[in-house]
Swiss-Prot record:
Its EC number is 2.6.1.52. The gene is serC. Its main location: cytoplasm. The modification N6-(pyridoxal phosphate)lysine is found at K197. One of its GO terms (molecular function) is O-phospho-L-serine:2-oxoglutarate aminotransferase activity. Catalyzes the reversible conversion of 3-phosphohydroxypyruvate to phosphoserine and of 3-hydroxy-2-oxo-4-phosphonooxybutanoate to phosphohydroxythreonine. Its cofactor is pyridoxal 5'-phosphate. GO terms for cellular component: cytoplasm. It is found in: Cytoplasm. Gene3D superfamilies: Aspartate Aminotransferase, domain 1, Type I PLP-dependent aspartate aminotransferase-like (Major domain). This is Phosphoserine aminotransferase. Belongs to the class-V pyridoxal-phosphate-dependent aminotransferase family. SerC subfamily.
Amino acid sequence: MSKRAFNFCAGPAALPDAVLQRAQAELLDWRGKGLSVMEMSHRSDDYVAIASKAEQDLRDLLDIPSDYKVLFLQGGASQQFAEIPLNLLPEDGVADYIDTGIWSKKAIEEARRYGTVNVAASAKEYDYFAIPGQNEWTLTKDAAYVHYASNETIGGLEFDWIPETGDVPLVTDMSSDILSRPLDVSRFGLIYAGAQKNIGPSGLVVVIVREDLLGRARSVCPTMLNYKTAADNGSMYNTPATYSWYLSGLVFEWLKEQGGVTAMEQRNRAKKDLLYKTIDASDFYTNPIQPSARSWMNVPFRLADERLDKPFLEGAEARGLLNLKGHRSVGGMRASIYNALGLDAVEALVAYMAEFEKEHG
């Protein structure tokens, strides 16, 4: 097998080599059963055991309290933009949303289809280069919930703090930074995360929801989108995304073997520190985000001359540094450095950046 490249894609993102090798070994014959996990009935004892272990491993990693349900659903995080208000926003209620970029704006637009949304704060006032402090927020006293995106993958903004919302449930899109460091789940009413960044392959979304928030869905909420339906049926009301669930379980096992989220925090800190240090020490590369709001997972940067973007990307690909092109709405470059990428990937990237700057700077 040829050497694997370093994949800096924002999602679907890199998976740990050990996980892919395990999946490859079990692809045709799972543990001597003579069939692939892809071919298993989701009702079989073997698959139920796979699913249950994945849930327990995730509970262990995040120390999820017993009064929270863990759901493995389909539709991705974008479907949650509708599912959350359908389940949590009464017809006469108000939901508070914090706007920090493209993904939170999409959530806001979708929620407005189902009820009243108060944009309690927006990073637009800071050109989306900083996150408004909570003292700048205008929260609704009796809001149904407060929603924010903990990390904006496109703009590269990340909260380094958890908002205080009192008795109002706190809801967060944690698609791109879940499992990157320790987390106090008890601070939240609901956490959701599309799998294809830091959990596993695409086709799956994980929802962690406090039990007292179940059973509040509107009468028009489709059965399939009702969290209580999923919770009451072990996320198997219909056939789930079985293989994505299985692979995510392998990722959870791998994370535990690496030392869990505490070890991931140390590893991720080293990666982001090296990359931002390289950018800040250069007159050739720039990142405009306020340092306290810089994402650990998604690092956008620009070159001094955008005409050099194409040769930079071509040179990177030739060196096995893939998917560094920034999002089409932002331009420039973006390095997504999720859990699966090691420090060696960032070291290879910054070495290339120094080489390119020396040649073109």
